[in-house]
């Protein structure tokens, strides 16, 4: 049959607008009218990324809009966090965690990134813990329960970090 429901992936809110990503284009949808407006294309973004030697996006489904008051989006390419201004078409900032990083947690309020390497926790380039084997920091403990699926928790301003420590 040719009749089927349209699958929409990656819908998210940016302030009062709904953002609908696709492979090649991001659209903004006005909730009251349903009017779609093109925000930016993957080709436009990739041109700027290539100029900055930051890699290329293969699709726009994983792009996030964590700032309701800024025309900026967040995405990762090859483990590198990239903040991109889609009004000015420019890379705002980039950060690549150290090799071996897992459990990355980007804080939109401060731009800090918490991550783990083996059993230790890092923020940006700095080691926060230096625990011996058998003591784990910054990762989920045992199993994901009560809607908790990570081991780090940023404060609202992004200047403090709470984390799980299991011995």
Which residues does each predicted region cover?
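Beta-propeller folds
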Residues: 1-167
